[in-house]
From Swiss-Prot:
Function: Effector that enhances P.infestans colonization of Nicotiana benthamiana leaves.
Keyword Ligase: no
Domain of life: Eukaryota
Keywords: Host cytoplasm, Host nucleus, Secreted, Signal, Virulence
Protein family membership: Belongs to the RxLR effector family.
Residue interval(s) of motif RxLR-dEER: 50-62
Protein name: RxLR effector protein PITG_07555
Region forming the signal peptide: 1-17
Cell compartments where the protein resides: Secreted; Host cytoplasm; Host nucleus
The keyword Nucleotide-binding belongs to this UniProt entry's keyword annotation: no
Domain topic, free-text comment: The RxLR-dEER motif acts to carry the protein into the host cell cytoplasm through binding to cell surface phosphatidylinositol-3-phosphate.
């Protein structure tokens, strides 16, 4: 469930960053010619929200509009954690009643940081964690896609990011 909340936060950040990106001020608008053609093809296709990724219309793929994704996220953030748990039928941990998804995400981050602080006090370094979890071997044998799904690799990356961003005196 912690990973789910982190995914929601990342999704929200990427959606808001995409919304703020403006192609109108780009000094080279020809860069977007291919996207423009694809956009016009979708509009000619009955104003449906589709994009043709291939020349074969049978392999057409539906795309969720950014506005509907942001709308869904806004509705989700207003719900309590119990409501979200019942929606997804997960219920991995149960915070106090009335806790919102944002508060649960903050709680998850605080627990993760506390765990990393304890690892740091136990003299765990990114190098020792990399050796313990055999990360070098995984990097050599696994694809990038497989590494992104490996929990040990994800934990190592999160701990390394934490380690790099914390000042030595903290």
């Amino acid at each position: 469930m912690q990973a789910y909340h982190l995914l929601l936060v990342c999704m929200y950040i990427s959606c808001s960053a995409y919304t703020n990106a403006s192609t109108a001020e780009d000094p080279n608008p020809n860069t977007y010619a291919e996207f423009s053609r694809m956009s016009h093809a979708a509009k000619d296709n009955g104003e449906s929200n589709r994009a043709l990724r291939t020349h074969n219309p049978d392999r057409e793929e539906r795309m969720m509009s950014l506005a509907s994704l942001e709308n869904w996220h806004a509705k989700l953030m207003g719900k309590t954690f119990e409501q979200v748990n019942s929606m997804f039928n997960k219920g991995k941990f149960n915070p106090p009643k009335g806790t919102t998804v944002g508060q649960a995400t903050d709680w998850t981050w605080s627990k993760t940081i506390a765990f990393f602080e304890q690892m740091k006090k136990d003299n765990t370094t990114p190098e020792s964690l990399k050796e313990t979890l055999n990360i070098a071997q995984k990097e050599a044998t696994m694809s990038a896609k497989a590494l992104r799904k490996d929990p040990d690799y994800l934990m190592y990356n999160a701990f390394k990011t934490f380690w790099d961003n914390k000042s030595p005196g903290v």
